[in-house]
Amino acid sequence: MDYFTLFGLPARYQLDTQALSLRFQDLQRQYHPDKFASGSQAEQLAAVQQSATINQAWQTLRHPLMRAEYLLSLHGFDLASEQHTVRDTAFLMEQLELREELDEIEQAKDEARLESFIKRVKKMFDTRHQLMVEQLDNEAWDAAADTVRKLRFLDKLRSSAEQLEEKLLDF
């Protein structure tokens, strides 16, 4: 059973996050291992396994990039374990330049420039994210997979920039 079915939700990217949260709580109550403490060893093991599956499904569906990757996996694109990389050389060059810029910001300890950089990367991420949503809605799986690969780069860059921000603020 796929994670969307487990949560009683349609297999699409855009979800009702409130329904997801409520269903998670219901499933957790229903399959909590403590409810099966007096059951047989097989029942206890099944409850632990079901609880682990529910937790994994919850983690996957509540995080946008993980949800997109999972949805794509249901359509034959296993992005989590693939060796396929981004082949868009212009995008890769842009990423290298952004990484170099982030390194320069770190060396200069330039908080104002870092703030501007973070905003710019967030805007780039948001633009690509919107494109991915449209591609997934239109079932353009190949294009969506390529966009998700690019979003991973941007997500890592954003995370690195935010970590640098924390580091600079701690000085």
Swiss-Prot record:
Q: Where is the signal peptide?
A: none
* J domain segment(s): 2-74
Gene Ontology biological-process annotations: [2Fe-2S] cluster assembly; protein complex oligomerization; protein folding
Which keywords fit this entry according to its UniProt record?
Chaperone
Please give an example of a GO cellular component term from this record: iron-sulfur cluster transfer complex
Q: State a single Pfam family of this protein.
A: HSCB_C
Cite a single GO MF annotation.
Answer: protein-folding chaperone binding
Tell me where on the tree of life, at the top rank, the source sits: Bacteria
> Has UniProt tagged this entry with the keyword Zinc-finger?
no
UniProt xrefs under InterPro entries: DnaJ_domain, HscB, HscB_C_sf, HscB_oligo_C, J_dom_sf
Briefly state the protein's biological role. Co-chaperone involved in the maturation of iron-sulfur cluster-containing proteins. Seems to help targeting proteins to be folded toward HscA.
| Summary of subunit composition and partner proteins | Interacts with HscA and stimulates its ATPase activity. Interacts with IscU.
The family note in this entry says: Belongs to the HscB family.
The cross-references to PANTHER family, in alphabetical order and at most eight, read: IRON-SULFUR CLUSTER CO-CHAPERONE PROTEIN HSCB (PTHR14021:SF15)
Task: Fetch the NCBIfam families from UniProt.
Answer: hscB (TIGR00714), PRK05014.1 (NF003449)
- Identification of the protein by name: Co-chaperone protein HscB
Q: Which organism is it from?
A: Escherichia coli O139:H28 (strain E24377A / ETEC)
Task: Identify the taxonomic lineage of the organism of origin.
Answer: Bacteria, Pseudomonadati, Pseudomonadota, Gammaproteobacteria, Enterobacterales
